[in-house]
C-alpha cells in the first residue's frame, strides 16, 4: 500500500477562520480530497465545553426510565425528529426492505428554525421538516443540543467556504444552498 494512504491528513481550519492562511488551508483540503478523499479537521472553533455539555446531558437523557424517554417519541412512525427506543428503527425500512431493526436507541433533531413554509408544496417534505421534539422537563436536552447544533451549522458554513476557495469560486458560492437545510 502506498504510504500516503496509511494516514488521513489533518488540516487545521484556524488559519482559514482567522484569515491568516485561507488559500493555504483551501489548497490542503483540495489536495486531501484529490489524493485520499477524506480528511480530519482540527481548529474548528467548536468549544470543548459545548461538546462535553451535549455529551453529558445526552447520557443523562438516555439513562432516564423508558417511560419518560417515550414522552419524546414522534406522534407518527414516519417522523424522525425526537426519541426512538431501542430496536424500533432501521435504515432498511426507509428503503422499503423488510429486515430486523437497528439495535440502537436514538434521539434525532433537525434545524432549529422552522423551514416548513418553504416546502409546503412538497408533501414528502412535511416529514423532513417536522418540528423538533426538545425535552426540557426531566432533563434540559434542548439547550446544550441547540448550542452544539448551531456550532455544527457554523462549521458546515466554514467548510463550504473552504471548498469554494479551493475550487476557485466565490467563498459564498455554496452558502445559499444550505440556508434551509434539514
Residue ranges, per PLM feature:
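Peripheral, non-catalytic segments flanking oxidoreductase cores
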Residues: 1-182
Amino acid at each position: 500500500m502506498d504510504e500516503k494512504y496509511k494516514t488521513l491528513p489533518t488540516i487545521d481550519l484556524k488559519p482559514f477562520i482567522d484569515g491568516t492562511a485561507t488559500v493555504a488551508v483551501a489548497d490542503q483540503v483540495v489536495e486531501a480530497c484529490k489524493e485520499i478523499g477524506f480528511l480530519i479537521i482540527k481548529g474548528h472553533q467548536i468549544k470543548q465545553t459545548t461538546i462535553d455539555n451535549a455529551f453529558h446531558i445526552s447520557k443523562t437523557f438516555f439513562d432516564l426510565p423508558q417511560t419518560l424517554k417515550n414522552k419524546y417519541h414522534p406522534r407518527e412512525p414516519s417522523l424522525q425528529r425526537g426519541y426512538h427506543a431501542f430496536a424500533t428503527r432501521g435504515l432498511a425500512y426507509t428503503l422499503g426492505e423488510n429486515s430486523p431493526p437497528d439495535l440502537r436507541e436514538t434521539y434525532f433533531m433537525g434545524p432549529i428554525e422552522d423551514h416548513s413554509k418553504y416546502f409546503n408544496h412538497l408533501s414528502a417534505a412535511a416529514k423532513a421538516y417536522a418540528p423538533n421534539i426538545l425535552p426540557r422537563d426531566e432533563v434540559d436536552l434542548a439547550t446544550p443540543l441547540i448550542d452544539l447544533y448551531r456550532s455544527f451549522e457554523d462549521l458546515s458554513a466554514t467548510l463550504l467556504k473552504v471548498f469554494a476557495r479551493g475550487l476557485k469560486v466565490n467563498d459564498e458560492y455554496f452558502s445559499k444552498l444550505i440556508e434551509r437545510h434539514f
